[in-house]
């Protein structure tokens, strides 16, 4: 996963359910690019 960005992965329903079009990081299994209040 070295040098891989979040945008390299497809969005996950889990991230979408947050209320924003967040990217899902396949490497860490977390959402990234989150700009929603209360979510970091």
Swiss-Prot record:
- Keyword Cytoplasm included in the entry's annotation: no
The reply to whether Secreted figures as a keyword in the UniProt entry is yes
- Tissue-by-tissue expression: Expressed by the venom duct.
Entry keywords, A to Z = Calcium channel impairing toxin, Cleavage on pair of basic residues, Disulfide bond, Ion channel impairing toxin, Neurotoxin, Secreted, Toxin, Voltage-gated calcium channel impairing toxin
Subcellular location(s) of the protein = Secreted
Listed GO CC annotations = extracellular region
Molecular functions per Gene Ontology: calcium channel regulator activity; toxin activity
| Chief localization | secreted
According to its UniProt record, how is this protein modified after translation? Contains 4 disulfide bonds.
Q: What is known of its domains?
A: The cysteine framework is XXVI (C-C-C-C-CC-CC).
Further remarks about this protein from its record: The framework of this peptide is described as framework XXIV but this framework name was already attributed to another cysteine pattern (see AC J7JU64). The framework is therefore renamed to the lowest available number, XXVI, and the peptide is consequently renamed RsXXVIA.
Instruction: Outline what the protein does.
Output: Omega-conotoxins act at presynaptic membranes, they bind and block voltage-gated calcium channels (Cav). This toxin inhibits rat Cav2.2/CACNA1B calcium channels in a dose-dependent manner (EC(50)=2.8 uM), whose effect is partially reversed after washing. In vivo, when injected into mice, it shows both an analgesic effect in acute thermal pain at 30 and 45 minutes post-injection and an anti-nociceptive effect in a formalin chronic pain test.
Name under which the protein is recorded: Omega-conotoxin RsXXVIA
| Species per Swiss-Prot/TrEMBL record | Conus regularis (Regular cone)
């Amino acid at each position: 996963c070295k040098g891989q960005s979040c945008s390299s992965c497809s969005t996950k329903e889990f991230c979408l359910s947050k209320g924003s079009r967040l990217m899902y990081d396949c490497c860490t299994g977390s959402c990234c690019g989150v700009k929603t209040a209360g979510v970091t």
